[in-house]
């Protein structure tokens, strides 16, 4: 299966693509993949992401662990698949509740920056410990 590349795809464009897909699949698809099931799928994908990260992390280099002998490129591909699946489910859930994921991300970044301000090197040098 070929995946078309979308350089510089915005979150809104991604939401639109998922919305178009879900509408094209119709009511039966929506009924069979309700929001509660979608959250369950999201949790499952987060578990797969955790396994992909552990597989890539050199500190977990147990040669007897499943997937340890897999080439790095395959491990990165698994990570990419997991991230893509998570993003799809986040987009679908956000659409179901009318949440703009871009706006949600910006609000989260503002909260993170308020809690953990980024200092320039000059500010760091001139501040007291």
What role is predicted for each listed range?
Residues 1-83, 87-129:
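Flexible "arm" and connector segments at domain edges
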């Amino acid at each position: 299966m070929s995946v078309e590349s979308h350089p510089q795809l915005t979150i809104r464009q991604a939401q639109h693509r998922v919305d178009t897909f879900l509408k094209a699949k119709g009511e039966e698809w929506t009924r069979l993949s309700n929001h509660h099931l979608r959250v369950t799928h999201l949790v499952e994908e987060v578990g797969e992401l955790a396994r992909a990260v552990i597989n890539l992390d050199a500190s977990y280099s147990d040669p007897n662990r499943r997937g340890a002998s897999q080439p790095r490129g395959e491990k990165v591909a698994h990570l990419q698949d997991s991230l893509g699946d998570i993003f799809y489910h986040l987009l679908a859930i956000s659409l179901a509740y009318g949440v703009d994921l871009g706006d949600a991300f910006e609000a989260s970044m503002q909260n993170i920056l308020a809690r953990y301000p980024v200092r320039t090197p000059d500010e760091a040098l001139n501040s007291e410990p």
